[in-house]
């Protein structure tokens, strides 16, 4: 029983870390190093504890933060960099896949809704 507790704590610490550093280029291997685990093990543990893969979690987090920044009136290219996407096109593609509309459309909808 002890081990699950400590594992879970590691994941919680990593989630906190991600929440503060989601704008940086953080790979799973870097997180695994921080946690003192193998990448393969952390990958499985992350999915078990969080219920989604690391990449999907990070993407969801970044898009959530991006939506907030777009609502706050930042330009799409600014938001792209602020949430960790150096490639503007790539950010727009990911955002569209995720939200079913481009960041600009999302921004327009937010303003219309006010």
Predicted segment positions?
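Residues within helix-turn-helix
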Residues: 29, 40, 75-78, 88-89, ...
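…primarily DNA-binding HTH/wHTH and HhH modules…
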Residues: 93-114
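Terminal helix-turn-helix DNA-binding modules in bacterial transcription factors
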Residues: 12, 16, 20, 25, ...
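Hydrophobic helix-rich structural segments at or within alpha/beta enzyme and signaling domains
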Residues: 1-4
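Short hydrophobic/aromatic patch on the recognition helix
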Residues: 42, 46, 90-91, 95
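Residues within the alpha-helical elements of helix-turn-helix
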Residues: 34, 82-83, 98
């Amino acid at each position: 029983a002890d081990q699950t507790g400590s594992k879970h704590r590691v994941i919680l610490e990593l989630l906190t870390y991600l929440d503060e550093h989601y704008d940086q280029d953080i790979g799973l291997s870097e997180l695994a190093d921080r946690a003192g685990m193998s990448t393969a093990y952390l990958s499985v543990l992350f999915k078990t504890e969080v219920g989604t893969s690391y990449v999907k979690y990070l993407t969801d987090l970044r898009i959530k933060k991006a939506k907030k920044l777009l609502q706050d009136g930042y330009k799409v290219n600014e938001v792209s960099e602020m949430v960790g996407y150096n490639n503007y096109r790539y950010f727009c593609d990911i955002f569209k896949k995720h939200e079913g509309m481009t960041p600009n459309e999302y921004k327009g909808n937010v303003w219309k809704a006010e």
